[in-house]
Amino acid sequence: SQKTDVISGQSGRLDTTKVWRAEYIEDNRIFHTYEDDNQPSFTVDLLLDASASRLQYQEMLAAQGVIIAKSLVECNIPVRVTRFCSVRGYTVFHILKSFRDKKCDNIFNYYAAGWNRDGLAFRGIGKILDMNPGVADRHLVIILTDAAPNDSQRILPSQDSPFGHDYSDDISVNDAAEEVRALRAKGIHVSAVFMGNDAAANSAEKIYGKEFTRIRRIDELAKAAGRLIQKEIQSLTR
């Protein structure tokens, strides 16, 4: 998205309020001219679930990520691509492409391993945005997900739950939904590309509300993400 700014210049449309400047202070910038400001209106964070459930799709998924990133770079929309997974109690983020990177080849380094603790992933991307928000005020986070958060590391005991809980099923879905709400409360737009079974579709709705689109095959990822980005662009013009 581009904004057009009116600036003073030595050619263009005469600004009658500035004619005096040419004679008295030898300033010839007495015309209105227009400059395209290529400042983007929003940034995109593409968050790729890299848990072991994606193992059979990892090459195709990486290729789709490259397609999305290249398209956004060509449109001058800053995009960051991050893979996440949970291993031995830690959620690991690997930034495959930063906002500054023009090349997208590192996205091919995507690989799948471990678990997916989605709630912690959303909290983490919020921290990453706090540290490096990019050049725009608005932010769109798009996650590729199966809407089935799962981790071998249990939720620790607490006053409400003295024995703790497995991080799975309703517990993990509610945790992810809570973190999505927290991001949205900060003004961050969160959408999902969902690829999973019918049972998980209900979980996707609990976590993302109506802000998700479903795909049946991994090679549909780029088109689905494109629709979500187009929706964001349309919301900017309202």
Language-model regions: role of each:
Residues 1-238:
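Acidic, glycine-rich A-domain
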